[in-house]
Amino acid sequence: MWKNHLCIVMAIEHYNPLGVIRSLGEAGVRPVFIAIKGRAKIASASKYISKCHFVDNIEEGYALLQSEYGNVAAETGIKPFLFSSDDKDIGYLDYHYDELKDKFICFNAGKQGRVNEFMDKHNILELAKKHGLSVLDNRVCQRGELPEGLRYPVITKSISPTIGGWKSDVHICHSEAELLAAYEQIEAPTVLVQEYIEKQNEYAIEGFSANKGKDVLLAIASTYDYILPDYYSPLMTVTNMNNEPVKKSLEGMLKEIGFEGVFEVEFLVAQDGTLYFLEINFRNSTWSYAATKARMPLPVLWAETMENGYMRADARKDINGSFTAMVEPIDYAKRVKTGKIDKAQWLVEFKQAKCGYYFSADDVEPWRICVENWDNLG
């Protein structure tokens, strides 16, 4: 039974791993948490943690993982499950997969370095096209290089989330001059320059893949309740993922990659409703906990499916219509502090949200820490 395995969450202190910890805890499993320093000790405050280690970076966390838990499989005959929720963490672990595969059951694509291969934005866009998804025109450029045959405006992105300045490498440029100016601020040596269009919305799918990508559950889909030009929206509407053509394409991609783990797929919704594939995040996403609220706890279902060798027939649950999920301090900052709504209206919507990413009546200490650090987290 999967619950007989030690479960370890190694991630930056954030509400993302808090969702993993709560998903496991609500299923009766108290994980070990290797907490990499973040803005505030949010996830480590959860009552569901059995033991917490504090480290400064992924390298220190990896060394601790090996020294403290690297012998568990040899001593007990049962490999621990290892959960990831940060791009740099999964990228680092993927480059050490040969050292991990006999000791842990972790997110992977069958061989060392293969997850990183498809964290490369160009590679994953090409695979998406192969499997029939729409993709915006793009070029791979070295920093300072002007793309040929690409119409403006364009958007710049680091070629991989493990390289460069992540969000600080994202610039919208309306001309060659603006692109050259943006290069002065971009950290990544290799840049994806992509056609930019005004979006109607975004479409994020949360799921898991197991048994070399043969078992895939696309559990929920989220769209944003309001759009921000340069930031994700912290208020979303959650439904079942019911787009069959997209489902078929994504199942084909995940099987070809051979991915085993929890993931998120991001699409841009154009003004005419066209879905343009953006990327797959090969780790637990911030929005994953909404699937737990929909009775589909992805970390639990992934571990269970990996243990059993098959996905149970009732893994997918029907959502009765839709529900709202909220990143509380960020939504407050974006709407109340800017005067879009007042505190009274915000409190009404806060209470109506079925999923809070910080608040839980059953696990209150992270919420207390959140409130103490409200401005810092917003």
Could you describe each region identified by the protein language model?
Residues 260-272:
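A short glycine-rich, hydrophobically flanked beta-strand micro-motif that places a catalytic Asp/Glu
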Residues 1-108, 373-376:
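ATP-binding N-terminal substructure of ATP-dependent carboxylate-amine bond-forming enzymes
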